């Protein structure tokens, strides 16, 4: 059924990670600009709420990230209840999320349609399989990259381009050096960005990122050539020539664009740096056949990202990239080739949301009385 262009939609977004703010922000703004109603429910994780505030996006925080599996299970239960209550209040036509059990369950309860966006292979852990098993069957539409196999009805799967390009595509992002200059960073001077993730999410169980010894070697190597800015979910290191990120969270992509190199164990920021044309070296224990499709694509098809599980091999690649004078021009050429192949993911997702919208939201299950 073709969407009715005159109909006003009510769309609820479930945002649980900083990257999801970026993924959905342009979709949300486009919906608002064309007269549709939106609501955002959020999770207090890392800088998620800071980003929403910086972009002026109204939101309701439903829970806070906690450490350990028992606490995470408890938080999930809290989000189930609070997401459903928020949906009852807002009466959405569509609920949009990443792989989020509370979002799809709330949609089922209130009679809304649900759109789930994912680009992640389901790992072999019991936790990973369970999380997807209690999400995907309840979704009306599952958006995934071409070639990703998911254990759900093929009829409700929709192909969606590389998700980071929903906010890093040139139609959506223009690098601005003035924001860096206001915060004491000269974009023409050499600097590197290093990222240390927390490795405490459900899909991180059994894996590890950059070790302390390799981290210190990376910083020593990079600081010989310029400033080193560190984004970390771990404790602040001592005795190293490293600085905290100099810009507010909403300017991180400008910082990544102008950086000479990125080194880290985070999947999201590694991908973002690569797509911005910054040489990106990713180091964690997941590298290999079990690695996510996007990392393999950026490395094999475009040569923008290099993933390693061996610290010494990663250090050798960092050294080679830093000493190769052809690197900047070559990486711009590689990025251009990626963008030539890339659609505007925001437009794709907008179309999917409009086509998925339920005819009405009056089919919602009434709230219990008494």
List where the protein language model places each region.
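Catalytic binding pocket for nucleotide-activated donors in carbohydrate/polymer assembly enzymes
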Residues: 275-326
């Amino acid at each position: 059924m073709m969407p009715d262009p005159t109909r006003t939609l009510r769309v609820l977004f479930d945002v649980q990670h900083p990257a999801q703010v970026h993924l959905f922000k342009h979709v949300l703004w486009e919906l608002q600009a064309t007269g549709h109603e939106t609501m955002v429910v959020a999770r207090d994780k890392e800088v998620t709420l800071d980003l929403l505030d910086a972009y002026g996006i109204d939101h309701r925080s439903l829970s806070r990230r906690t450490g350990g599996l028992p606490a995470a299970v408890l938080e999930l239960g809290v989000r189930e209840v609070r997401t459903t209550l928020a949906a009852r209040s807002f009466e959405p036509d569509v609920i949009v999320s990443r792989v989020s059990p509370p979002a799809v369950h709330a949609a089922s309860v209130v009679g809304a349609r649900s759109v789930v966006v994912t680009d992640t292979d389901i790992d072999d852990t019991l936790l990973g399989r369970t999380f997807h098993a209690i999400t995907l069957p309840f979704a009306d539409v599952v958006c995934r990259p071409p070639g990703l196999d998911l254990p759900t009805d093929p009829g409700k799967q929709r192909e969606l381009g590389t998700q980071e390009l929903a906010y890093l595509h040139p139609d959506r992002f223009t690098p601005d050096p003035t924001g860096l200059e206001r915060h004491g960073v000269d974009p023409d001077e050499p600097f590197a960005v290093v990222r240390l993730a927390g490795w405490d999410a459900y899909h991180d169980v059994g894996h590890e990122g950059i070790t302390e010894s390799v981290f210190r070697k990376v910083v020593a190597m990079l600081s010989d050539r310029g400033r080193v800015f560190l984004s970390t979910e771990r404790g602040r290191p001592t005795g190293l020539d490293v600085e905290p990120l100099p810009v507010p969270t909403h300017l991180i992509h400008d910082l990544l664009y102008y950086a000479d190199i990125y080194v880290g164990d985070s999947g999201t920021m590694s991908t973002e740096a690569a797509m911005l044309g910054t040489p990106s070296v990713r180091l964690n224990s997941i590298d290999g056949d079990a690695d996510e499709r996007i990392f393999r694509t950026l490395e094999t098809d475009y040569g923008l990202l290099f993933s390693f599980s061996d610290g010494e091999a990663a250090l050798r690649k960092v050294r080679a990239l830093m000493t190769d004078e052809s690197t900047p021009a070559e990486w711009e050429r590689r990025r251009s080739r990626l963008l030539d192949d890339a659609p505007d993911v925001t437009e794709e997702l907008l179309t999917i949301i409009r086509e998925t919208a339920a005819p009405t939201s009056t089919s919602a299950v009434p709230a219990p009385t008494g």
